[in-house]
């Protein structure tokens, strides 16, 4: 309908998968690199998660195309299966004949024999499960049992799980802890940034034959805001916006076209009216002198030095303090305030709804989620958002800012608490979310193909951490790889010679990068990194006996 009007060979924003419209953003590239590394490492499970429409299937298709030709793949698209159905589906994908009445053991044995035959023939075997958040715990356990099949040197089967964020929550269940421990690579795919949305739209238009910029800058800003950076929503909104512009006879897509299209697609009404725009402009004129204008655009105050304040006064355990804890818990039943406190510890004042992992790259940070023991979390040396269990089994959230041999400091709601380390161990389930500083260029993976800026940063950081002299370097050479592997071995990491998120996170600490640290406050020359908004609050002490 509108293609000829805009000089297009075909509709550029169809939601049907088409390889020629494949746009790999930096985040999609990172996800693909992590999955490839996990499969090359020979581990049991590789995990990719992301919200609906962020491009998980796009990444999985690229992964399948990049696998060696000697790889046999079982692609499971309908994971709403029983344990037997799963094994039967894998047999179907591997083209293994079986009797329709075959039970679990027979199907399992068929798959085992086939995996052994593939190994003898020099082939790799991979099972890829899409929409894996729909798998039942028993089915996930059956997959784990399949990955138990191994020789002295390698596993016979690797499994790629792709799903929505609920999959991460599922894997934190105690009954699935053995499976979670076998995940050798994981990546959470975030929505596109504003810059990526701009590039994504231009790319799809160019593929369809349009070389002129037909979306105005304001339209692209509105598109990013109303789509949330979700590629599927971007496609739907852009398609409707092209229709709207065509209907009014304009060759330019403007802010109003995007707003109308977004409302038609998702029912989201754009609150960015002229009245609110005027208020922002007036507020900006008043606040620019104090540096708050950046918050209007980015959701954060400008970066400040890491906040360090005086240790609050400790209070003895009393029934009143137990009641105070109950009140604090009631204000911390959602993770929002704990995440906001985590940003404050890093020196960023942000609105509650802006304090999310998705917004971390705006501040030059990355989110990392995982499971660990207290000792493992302490080794990471980063303050973290943690979930705790109260005496009734309910979940609440806190920010861990200090961790010593006997005590820990928490922020629960708007109050500081000191707890026994054993108390924390008893009531913490092991999951955490932390923020860490990205290297220059905003990348979370530095390897052979890294640019000169990232390579120089990595070499400088390794030199400081290993107490070696600095040098000039522009490419990822053998000396840099050796230094990186030495650092990884010293830190108990896999010495793969690739600086992924775990390596970069440890490197930030060892290289002395400016950051808040999760260290024992008794070892500090200064005082713990606690938000300055809590200066006047006394620290409440809670012992294990009091719990």
Swiss-Prot record:
Gene3D superfamilies for this protein: Cysteine proteinases, P-loop containing nucleotide triphosphate hydrolases, PGBD-like superfamily/PGBD
Residues that, per the record, bind ATP: 50-57
Record keywords: ATP-binding, Cell membrane, Cytoplasm, Membrane, Nucleotide-binding, Transport
InterPro entries the UniProt entry points to: AAA+_ATPase (IPR003593), AAA_22 (IPR049945), ExeA_AAA_ATPase_DNA-bind (IPR052026), GspA_C39-like (IPR048809), P-loop_NTPase (IPR027417), Peptidoglycan-bd-like (IPR002477), PGBD-like_sf (IPR036365), PGBDSf (IPR036366)
Topology term for the membrane: Peripheral membrane protein
Pfam families: AAA_22 (PF13401), GspA_C39-like (PF21327), PG_binding_1 (PF01471)
Bias (Polar residues): 524-533
GO CC, alphabetical: cytoplasm; plasma membrane
Subcellular compartments: Cytoplasm; Cell membrane
Domain of life: Bacteria
Principal cellular location given in the protein's record: cytoplasm
A single MF term (Gene Ontology): ATP hydrolysis activity
Region (Disordered): 512-547
PANTHER family: GENERAL SECRETION PATHWAY PROTEIN A-RELATED (PTHR35894), PHOSPHORIBULOKINASE _ URIDINE KINASE FAMILY (PTHR35894:SF1)
Family: Belongs to the ExeA family.
Protein name listed in UniProt: General secretion pathway protein A
């Amino acid at each position: 309908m509108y293609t000829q009007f805009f000089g297009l060979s075909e509709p550029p924003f169809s939601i049907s998968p088409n390889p020629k419209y494949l746009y790999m953003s930096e985040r999609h590239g990172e996800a693909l690199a992590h999955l490839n590394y996990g499969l090359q490492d020979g581990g049991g499970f590789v995990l990719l998660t992301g919200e609906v429409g962020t491009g998980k299937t796009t990444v999985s298709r690229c992964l399948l195309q990049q696998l060696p030709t000697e790889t046999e793949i079982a692609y499971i698209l309908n994971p709403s299966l029983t344990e037997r159905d799963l094994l039967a589906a894998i047999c179907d994908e591997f083209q293994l004949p079986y009797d329709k009445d075959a039970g679990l053991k027979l199907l399992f044995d068929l798959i085992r024999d086939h995996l052994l035959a593939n190994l003898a023939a020099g082939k790799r075997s991979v099972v890829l499960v899409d929409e894996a958040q729909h798998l039942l715990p028993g089915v996930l356990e059956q997959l784990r049992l399949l990955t138990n099949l191994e020789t002295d040197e390698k596993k016979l089967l690797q499994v790629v799980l792709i799903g929505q964020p609920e999959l991460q929550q599922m894997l934190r269940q105690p009954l699935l802890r053995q499976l979670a421990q076998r995940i050798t690579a994981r990546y959470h795919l975030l929505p596109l940034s504003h810059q990526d949305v701009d590039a994504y739209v231009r790319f799809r238009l160019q593929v369809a034959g349009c070389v002129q910029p037909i979306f105005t800058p304001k339209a692209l800003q509105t598109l990013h805001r109303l789509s949330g950076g979700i590629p599927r929503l971007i496609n739907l909104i852009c398609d409707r916006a092209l229709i709207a512009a065509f209907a009014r006879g304009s060759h330019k897509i403007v802010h109003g076209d995007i707003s109308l299209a977004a409302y038609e697609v998702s029912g989201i009404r754009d609150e960015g009216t002229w009245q609110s725009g005027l208020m922002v402009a007036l507020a900006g004129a008043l606040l620019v002198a104090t540096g708050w204008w950046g918050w209007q655009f980015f959701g954060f105050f400008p970066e400040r030095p890491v906040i360090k304040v005086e240790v609050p006064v400790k209070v003895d355990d009393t029934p009143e303090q137990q009641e105070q804890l109950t009140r604090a818990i009631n204000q911390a039943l959602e993770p929002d305030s704990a995440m906001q406190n985590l940003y404050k510890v890093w020196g960023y004042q942000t609105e509650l709804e802006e304090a999310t992992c998705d917004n971390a790259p705006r501040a030059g940070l990355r989110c990392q989620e995982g499971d660990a023991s207290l000792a493992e979390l302490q080794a990471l040396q980063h303050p973290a958002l943690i979930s705790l269990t109260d005496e009734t089994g309910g979940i609440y959230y806190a920010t861990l800012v200090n961790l010593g041999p006997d005590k820990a400091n928490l922020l629960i709601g708007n109050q500081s608490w000191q707890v026994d380390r054993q108390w924390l161990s008893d009531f913490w389930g092991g999951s955490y979310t932390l923020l860490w500083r990205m290297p220059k260029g905003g990348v979370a993976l530095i390897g052979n193909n890294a640019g000169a800026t990232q390579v120089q940063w990595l070499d400088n950081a390794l030199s400081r951490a290993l107490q070696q002299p600095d040098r000039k370097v522009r490419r990822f050479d053998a000396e840099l790889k050796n230094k990186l592997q030495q650092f990884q071995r010293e830190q108990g990491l896999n010495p793969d010679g690739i600086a992924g998120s775990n390596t970069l996170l440890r490197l930030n600490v060892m290289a002395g990068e400016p950051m808040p640290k999760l260290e024992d406050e008794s070892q500090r020359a200064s005082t713990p990194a606690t938000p300055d908004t809590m200066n006047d609050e006394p620290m409440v002490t809670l012992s294990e006996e009091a719990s």
